[in-house]
Amino acid sequence: MKTQEIEKKVRQQDAQVLAQGYSPAIRAMEIAAIVSFVSLEVALVYRLWGTPYAGTWLLLSAVLLGYLAADFVSGFVHWMGDTWGSTEMPVLGKALIRPFREHHVDEKAITRHDFVETNGNNCLISLPVAIIALCLPMSGPGWVFCASFLGAMIFWVMATNQFHKWSHMDSPPALVGFLQRVHLILPPDHHRIHHTKPYNKYYCITVGWMNKPLTMVHFFPTAERLITWATGLLPRQDDIGAEAARALVVAAGGSEAPVVQAAKELLTQATVQEKPASTRP
């Protein structure tokens, strides 16, 4: 099925209804998440500052690898939010999935969000990792690197939606525009690829460096086919409507990658149990 035919089948939710889903309770939760996140990151920096193992190269490598990891994490979370779940789910639907649905029907809405609404969700999902990083022992270079890497990764994860917001602004600040042009943060033209119906590619939105490698290995399409095969769930049904979602699955069905076939065989073998031998004489 041609892409144009699939685009005609797309049916999205109402932008105003989605925007109204941002409740005072969700905002209070996001404020608490931001305060908690900043407190944990400051505590982690304090611990790292006092260790003799935190060398310059160790910290720089942790920051760079953390940036790449954050880009991948942003893509994975973005893919999960775009592809699975529903706005009607308890708690998660309004707090986490709703913003993904709103963004596809009103992509400029994010430019009207303040700091809390823009960054609160990412602070919230980063809290468990921040606690783990803070609890790691600082008894050697390896542990210090792990703590630094995790701390850097979640810092960039926290900044992801801010970079994402800037990529949708018509006139971002001058320094931001420069960083976008040299592709040190997410550039608007690069992100535009994702905002082409049916919104099924280029999910990484911290900087976008991981988009091409993940596209080359068919990472997200492979994951979708395996999940659909194993569970029967239809990817993007809540985002673009059941008809368009089914059309996408049918269009992709004829080009199944060998790795998907192999994974299906392994899963089948793992789930099929042999019948116990009869003990009757």
From Swiss-Prot:
GO molecular function, one term: plasmanylethanolamine desaturase activity
Catalytic activities: a 1-(1,2-saturated alkyl)-2-acyl-sn-glycero-3-phosphoethanolamine + 2 Fe(II)-[cytochrome b5] + O2 + 2 H(+) = a 1-O-(1Z-alkenyl)-2-acyl-sn-glycero-3-phosphoethanolamine + 2 Fe(III)-[cytochrome b5] + 2 H2O; 1-O-(13-methyltetradecyl)-2-(13-methyltetradecanoyl)-sn-glycero-3-phosphoethanolamine + 2 Fe(II)-[cytochrome b5] + O2 + 2 H(+) = 1-O-(1Z-13-methyltetradecenyl)-2-(13-methyltetradecanoyl)-sn-glycero-3-phosphoethanolamine + 2 Fe(III)-[cytochrome b5] + 2 H2O
Root EC class: oxidoreductase
Key word Amino-acid biosynthesis present: no
GO annotations of cellular component type: plasma membrane
Primary location class: membrane
Residue stretches spanning the membrane: 29-45, 59-75, 124-138, 143-159
Cytoplasmic side: 1-28, 76-123, 160-281
Enzyme Commission number(s) from the entry: 1.14.19.77
Site (Essential for plasmanylethanolamine desaturase activity): H78, H103, H104, H113
Phenotypic consequence of gene deletion: Deletion prevents the activation of the light inducible promoters of carQ, crtI and carB.
Consequence recorded when altering H78A: Impaired carotenoid synthesis caused by loss of plasmanylethanolamine desaturase activity
Keyword Translocase in annotation: no
Record-stated family: Belongs to the fatty acid desaturase CarF family.
Record PANTHER family: PLASMANYLETHANOLAMINE DESATURASE 1, TRANSMEMBRANE PROTEIN 189
Subunit structure as annotated in this protein's UniProt entry: Interacts with CarR.
Record-given protein name: Plasmanylethanolamine desaturase
Organism expressing this protein natively: Myxococcus xanthus
